[in-house]
Structure formats: C-alpha cells, structure tokens
C-alpha cells in the first residue's frame, strides 16, 4: 500500500517510521510519503490560509496549495489514491473503517489546520473521517491514528496475523485478559486454565472473559453482535455470578 499525507508539519509523522510501521516501510510492505503543501503556494508570503468570504472567525485553508500538492502526488504515484479528509463532520472512525481502508492500494490524507477548508477542496475528496466528537488543532494526529490502525490489517505489517485478528473490536468484543511469566507474581496468580494445556477450555475461558469485559466496559458493542447460543449461555452465567 502507498500512503500519502498532505500536511504543513511533515516532521510530526517521523514517529510513524519507527517500530512496526518502520519495519513495514523498510521491507516494502508500506510506501509512505508526506508532502508539505506550503511548498505549492503561489503567493510571495507562502500563505496557505485566508479570511472567509462573508466574514466570520478564523482562517480557511486555501484551495490552490491543496489542489497543486494533490496534482504532484498524482504525478508521482500514478493516481491520487483514495483521498481522506480529516474533518469533525466526517463519519466516525472505528475498527471497521480501518479494515475497509486497508483494502485500498493507495490512501491520501489531507491534514488541515485553521478554522476549516475552502469548500472547493472537497471536490478532491473521496472520504471524510472524524476521530470523534471533539476538535484537535490539526489533522495530523487524526491521520496518524488512522494510518496506524489501518496498517495493522496489511499483509506483512504485523509479525503475526493472528494478532490483528484477535485484537479488541475485531469481532465486536474486547480482548480477553492475557498473562506472561511468572505464573505467580507476588501472590497474583495466572488462572489455572491457561496453564492446563486444554485448548478447548482455554478457548472457552477466553471467550467468556471477552464477553465479561465487553459487557462491563462497552455493552454497546454487544448490541451490534449476533450472539451464538454458546455466547448467550456464557453471558447469562456472567450476569448471574
């Protein structure tokens, strides 16, 4: 997958080139580029924003630098990709959106600043996404969150594909508790079933604990899940414990 970002602050994306994503970039599983759209301004002061027509508070991102930066991306990549605008008015980002975006071969993020965008910028956009009902100072943090979450679904990004498949929210359930050595840490013992070697019992315990954690912390997720009879029985047990 190729990922492009249009941003005024390219250095903010340096951390994405570390750790798991950095390794994915190094081995070619991810092709990552950041374009400073200030480089594409046509005015002598390199301004990328201006006052809104009709008055109002704040400044708006101008269309020209974004259009020209996008043209440069298209020239370099052969296409502009699936263009995502980070905007509070967009659809709310979640696990399923990340999985959907991971099916694209090329993503381009527009990370804006200021009060908002010149409406004509939206002509370039295929998707508008929001992280939630709050406002950030710019779109960079939102873009980084989406890129990180989306990249986890790409082949060869995670060392173990099962990790992505078993992560929280993969199946509208929160992840079950996990433990590593030692089996007894200062009197805090690992549940016996996890050391029993009985894979069927371990799977049942994990499912039950996923259901328990979801019911206790995010019951709304259960509303969007069609429970099997086994899951209904386990959930009934949990509620009556």
From Swiss-Prot:
Assign the protein's first listed, main location to one coarse class.
Answer: cytoplasm
Q: Which InterPro entries does the annotation name?
A: Alpha/beta_knot_MTases, tRNA_m1G_MeTrfase_C_sf, tRNA_m1G_MeTrfase_TrmD, tRNA_m1G_MTases_N, tRNA_MeTrfase_TRMD/TRM10
Decide whether keyword Methyltransferase is in the record.
yes
Q: One Gene Ontology cellular component annotation?
A: cytosol
Task: Provide the alphabetized UniProt keywords.
Answer: Cytoplasm, Methyltransferase, S-adenosyl-L-methionine, Transferase, tRNA processing
What the entry lists under CDD domains is as follows: TrmD-like (cd18080)
Annotated localization: Cytoplasm
Broad class of enzyme this protein falls into? transferase
Q: Source organism's superkingdom? A: Bacteria
Q: Which GO terms describe its biological process?
A: tRNA N1-guanine methylation
Record carries keyword ATP-binding:
no
Molecular function as annotated in GO: tRNA (guanine(37)-N1)-methyltransferase activity
Which E.C. number(s) belong to this protein? 2.1.1.228
Tell me the Pfam families matching this sequence. tRNA_m1G_MT
Quaternary state and interactors: Homodimer.
Q: What does this protein do?
A: Specifically methylates guanosine-37 in various tRNAs.
Report the sequence similarity comment from the record. Answer: Belongs to the RNA methyltransferase TrmD family.
The protein's name: tRNA (guanine-N(1)-)-methyltransferase
* Species name: Leuconostoc citreum (strain KM20)
- Phylogenetic placement of the source organism: Bacteria, Bacillati, Bacillota, Bacilli, Lactobacillales
């Amino acid at each position: 997958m190729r990922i492009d970002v249009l941003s005024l602050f390219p250095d903010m994306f340096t951390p994405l080139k570390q750790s798991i994503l950095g390794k994915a970039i190094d081995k070619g599983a991810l092709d990552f580029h950041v374009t400073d759209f200030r480089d594409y301004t046509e005015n002598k002061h390199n301004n990328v924003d201006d006052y809104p027509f009709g008055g109002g508070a704040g400044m708006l991102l101008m269309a020209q630098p974004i259009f020209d930066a996008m043209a440069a991306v298209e020239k370099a990549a052969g296409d502009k990709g699936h263009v995502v605008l980070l905007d509070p008015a967009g659809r709310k980002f979640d696990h399923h959106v990340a999985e959907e975006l991971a099916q694209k071969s090329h993503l381009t993020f527009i990370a804006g600043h200021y009060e908002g965008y010149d409406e004509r910028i939206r002509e370039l956009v295929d998707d508008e996404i929001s992280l939630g009902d709050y406002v950030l100072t710019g779109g960079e943090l939102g873009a980084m969150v989406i890129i990180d979450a989306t990249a986890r679904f790409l082949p060869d990004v995670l060392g173990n594909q099962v990790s992505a498949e078993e992560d929280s929210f993969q199946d509208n359930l929160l992840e079950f508790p996990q433990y590593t050595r030692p089996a007894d840490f200062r009197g805090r013992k690992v549940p016996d079933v996890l050391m029993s070697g009985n894979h069927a019992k371990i799977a049942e315990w994990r499912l039950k604990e996923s259901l328990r954690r979801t019911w206790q912390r995010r019951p709304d997720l259960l509303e969007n899940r069609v429970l099997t009879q086994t899951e209904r029985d386990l959930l009934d047990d949990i509620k009556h414990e």
